[in-house]
Design a protein with these regions (language model features):
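Extracellular loop and loop/strand-boundary signature of outer-membrane beta-barrel proteins
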Residues: 35-38, 90-98, 154-161, 206-213
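Short glycine/proline- and aromatic-enriched beta-strand/turn motifs that initiate or cap beta-hairpins
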Residues: 21-65, 69-70, 75-76, 220, ...
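Cleavable N-terminal export/targeting peptides
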Residues: 1-29, 229
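Gram-negative (and chloroplast) outer-membrane scaffold detector with strong preference
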Residues: 54-150, 166-167
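Residues that define the transmembrane beta-barrel architecture of outer-membrane proteins
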Residues: 30-32, 42-48, 58, 99-105, ...
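Transmembrane beta-strands of outer-membrane beta-barrel pores
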Residues: 38-42, 66-72, 111-113, 130-138, ...
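Predominantly the C-terminal beta-signal and adjacent terminal strand-loop region
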Residues: 168-229
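Membrane-embedded beta-strand positions of outer-membrane beta-barrel proteins
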Residues: 34-38, 62-66, 107, 126-130, ...
């Protein structure tokens, strides 16, 4: 009988603990959140994203975001080369296309700890997001064809829909909440290959594959501002 009472008390405590933690936890008081996130990654690119998330369970949120990724520096080895096309003998990549720019959507799940610490009106916890970046499956570049004579050139757009369009990622972070506002800082790890579409662009027996190094892992740091309601 004693063992049964002990087990019953243990089960009751296990059931009540999440309820009491939820009731006293600062971060579970509001169900909806709007986020603005900025990221710098190891592919010389910045990302800007707007997202919405909803609390599904006390410490589990689901969200969806949309944004843009753009390089501020390109590390391509070549931006021109030889070609045999009509009377033209060489090609040159448009300067506007030196740096990759992509649009993306980002569905994700966020798992958070209960509130770990607070000081005055500042409340702190840890969270981790996991999801997939869904890239717009299209990329184009402008190519100018030259023959060595001034004012004799031709400009064409070449495009592809082949490339890495689904990119898994994780984002561990430290989060601080003050009333309705939140601030997060953390790291991002993904399988982003930023040049995957570029390497699939071909024109007149010329492949851009050799211009870009293959890198299957990307890391970055991000800052997030949020409003909860």
């Amino acid at each position: 009988m004693t063992h049964r009472k002990t087990i019953s008390l243990f089960l009751l405590a296990a059931l009540l603990l999440p309820v009491s933690a939820t009731a006293s936890d600062f971060f579970t008081k509001r169900e909806n959140q709007i986020n603005m996130t900025g990221t710098l990654n190891s592919r010389y690119a910045w990302q800007l994203e707007l997202s919405y998330q909803h609390r599904l369970l006390p410490f589990v949120d689901v969200g969806i975001g949309a944004g843009m990724l753009k390089q501020w520096y390109d590390d391509a080895e070549v931006a021109s080369g030889d070609v045999a096309y009509k009377e033209y003998t060489s090609w040159r990549l448009s300067e506007d296309d030196y740096r990759v720019q992509k649009l993306f959507a980002r569905p994700y799940v966020q798992v958070s700890t209960p509130e770990l610490w607070h000081s005055g009106s500042c409340h702190f916890r840890l969270n981790t997001q996991a999801g997939v970046m869904l890239m717009l499956p299209y990329e184009s570049v402008g190519i100018t064809y030259l023959n060595g004579r001034p004012h004799e050139e031709e400009y064409k757009i070449h495009s592809t829909s082949k490339g890495q369009w689904a990119v898994p990622f994780v984002r561990p972070a430290v989060e601080m909440g003050i009333e309705d506002l939140g601030f997060s800082m953390g790291a991002e790890f993904s399988t982003l290959d930023i040049y995957s579409f570029r390497r699939n662009i071909r024109f007149h027996n010329v492949s851009m594959d050799g211009m870009y190094e293959k890198k299957r892992f990307t890391w970055g740091v991000f800052l997030n501002l949020s409003y909860s309601f």
